[in-house]
Amino acid sequence: MCRHLGWLGAQVAVSSLVLDPPQGLRVQSYAPRRQKHGLMNADGWGVGFFDGAIPRRWRSPAPLWGDTSFHSVAPALRSHCILAAVRSATVGMPIEVSATPPFTDGHWLLAHNGVVDRAVLPAGPAAESVCDSAILAATIFAHGLDALGDTIVKVGAADPNARLNILAANGSRLIATTWGDTLSILRRADGVVLASEPYDDDSGWGDVPDRHLVEVTQKGVTLTALDRAKGPR
């Protein structure tokens, strides 16, 4: 489980999204307000951002609230596309840098908020870690992000107890799924935020319904039901 956040829009400082808000990921690492599973997210953190078309990452298995080095540098890290997460490790999963989101295939950054039975996922050398989220990320990368909705539906059918909230970015797109946990959206004048929970009390935040796929591009926001019978919205 984790709390994650994505940004697509104008160039902004990483700190303005992750550290500065009154209920940003720094605070969510020890006092989340809407987390359904787990009490805090102290098993690591990661920030990914795009330098042109190149994804860059800074990850740590330590709690975000105590990382003074990151706090001092984050105001200088700026990007138009950012993906960040704080982690609450699934019981039995390793606490290490390689198990900490965001994961990458060299083009996309990806975070998973939830849990999945590794037995329903194909094992392969592409996974960054043996943890469930890393193996799920490798599976999603192998099928392609354009097929994210189909992949989540299939994995969810194979493991009915899975929680499969995904957030991914490639520099020009944000894609997210809701499958068992919360996701909120904020449309700002300078861009769009997708987040596990609001980072402040702005009245513009809205909730994304469960079992939906959200895509954010420069053209706008698209919301599609993962239940085929509901169709696009």
Swiss-Prot record:
InterPro entries in alphabetical order: EgtC (IPR017808), EgtC-like (IPR026869), EgtC_Actinobacteria (IPR032889), Gamma-glu_amide_hydrolase (IPR052373), GATase_2_dom (IPR017932), Ntn_hydrolases_N (IPR029055)
Pfam families referenced in this protein's UniProt entry, alphabetically: GATase_4
Any one cellular-component term (Gene Ontology): plasma membrane
Key words, A-Z: Glutamine amidotransferase, Hydrolase
Enzyme class: hydrolase
Pathway: Amino-acid biosynthesis; ergothioneine biosynthesis
Active site: 2 (nucleophile)
One of the protein's GO biological processes: ergothioneine biosynthesis from histidine via gamma-glutamyl-hercynylcysteine sulfoxide
EC number of this enzyme: 3.5.1.118
Protein task: Catalyzes the hydrolysis of the gamma-glutamyl amide bond of hercynyl-gamma-L-glutamyl-L-cysteine sulfoxide to produce hercynylcysteine sulfoxide, a step in the biosynthesis pathway of ergothioneine. Ergothioneine is an antioxidant that protects mycobacteria from oxidative stress.
HAMAP family: EgtC
Protein name: Gamma-glutamyl-hercynylcysteine sulfoxide hydrolase
Source organism of this protein record: Mycobacterium tuberculosis (strain ATCC 25618 / H37Rv)
Classification of source organism: Bacteria, Bacillati, Actinomycetota, Actinomycetes, Mycobacteriales
Gene name of the encoded protein: egtC
